[in-house]
Amino acid sequence: MHSNQVDGRELTLSFERWTFSFLLCLALPTCAARAELPTNAIPTLAALRSNLTVRVEHPRLAAAQLGVKIVSLDTGKTLFEHNAGKLLKPASNAKLYTGALALDRLGPQFRIRTSCYSAAKPDADGTLAGDLTVFGRGDFSMAARFNGGDHTKSLEPLVTALAAAGVKRITGDLIGDESFFHGPPFGSAWTWDDLNYYYGAEVSALTHEDNVVDLAFKPAAVLGQSVTLTTKPATQFLEFINRTTTVTNGGKRSLALHRPLAQSTVFLHGSLPADDKGWTDAMPVPRPAQWFVTQLRTALAQRGITIAGQLRTRDWLASEATRVDYSKWVEIAFTESRPMSELVAQMMKPSQNLYAQLLLLQVGARTHKPGQTTEEAGLAELQKFLAEAGVKRGTALLEEGSGLSRGCLLTPDASVQLLRHMEQHPAAATFRASLPIAGVDGTLKSRFAGTAAARTVLAKTGSLRYVNSLCGHVTTAAKERLVFSLMLNAYTGTTVSGREVIDELAVLLANFSGKSDGP
């Protein structure tokens, strides 16, 4: 049995006869009975500290590691700390650092440009002689998430731009150039068993629909027939070998998906009862640049724009002989992403790993040097930024931009200092607005219902197997503004889940009616 936790949505699927249960950072029901969250007002600082101490020293945490830091933005005083200098796995709390870096180095209004290059403009008849190259720079907003859930609109701006440039037919090839980023298509230390799932999608400067295909399974109308499968967006990029069966009512749902790494064939096994309401999943695609131009060709054809040649891609490993100096080419069309303020929010609220890594690379692409990967350059720039923010050296160690790597380490001290710094930053309001709001949206939409924390906690979640974290802002019952970092590692409890341990602490802060400089 292999189980893991990631921020996002709940998946339970069979894979090569193992069950992978992904219990996510949404507040979904747990196997154990839910713990009752605190409701009583806490009138004094002494009472708050007493309540917090009882919980952080609870015997159920004896084998775990818990780090806590709570500071008032209004007075600057530390209300409580426990193991605040200990390095712990942050999971997706790492995204706070990536989001802050992107806003600082690029600015809230920054947009990512995707360019269409050719040797010359199309002629009067709309014929583009030779190849058309789409040069990506990491725009991830070509996705249904940014278009009201409509997959058909994701590539529409790019197609419209080409049509507006007068392109009706292309005599050469359609080339997807993803060479803007230098390095492997995954974040450092992402593990192999993450790569077959949507949250481990390949990273590319040409990204379309989060580099995944959404899958919907329903039982067939006739017993014994294969389960029906539909995909969004519609595509032939993935080949599905369907070996599933529709079984009698009341049977057990047992579906297995397997796509060998770097291959585009997906094997489907198992069964679905005839009375099953259906099941959804998502499968990451291999070779995202190839996926991009494949889908673009289809979108162009629907607009009546034809391509006579083949589909090709170009990456950072291209030889000197095949590299292109685009300054000598004509940019016949381009699109720009949504502003960075929106990109950061769409990364933070649903806790999107691909977006986080792409934002780190976006920063790194502007500073990377020969012999250095774009990721290495981005991480180096992050360390410079953290030094400027007053974060002590050695207290924030990230290996990639999302927190999916278990090699990422942070201290509660570092995260609280980052939050305090961002409150003084020109992009303070943008950064704060990117955080999930308890009981309202993102990965906190279903958490803290009926408690004082609802709508008063704005925080980034983090969840991996045996790891739970929450870091952000809370407004107390006395309207004092606090920032906090709660990090729980190596916790295996089942009676009370790790998420519930963290939530109890956050609700105590929301219930605090005293003052940080009071008794």
Please give the residue ranges for each predicted region.
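N-terminal secretory signal peptides that target proteins for export/translocation
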Residues: 1-16
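Bacterial N-terminal signal peptides
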Residues: 19-30
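Signal peptide processing junction and immediate N-terminal pro/mature segment
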Residues: 30-36
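Conserved serine DD-peptidase/penicillin-binding transpeptidase domain
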Residues: 36-58, 104-394, 478, 500-501, ...
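A short, well-structured edge-of-sheet supersecondary motif
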Residues: 58-82, 312
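Small-residue-rich helix-loop
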Residues: 79-81, 350, 360-519
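Short active-site loop at a secondary-structure junction
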Residues: 81-101
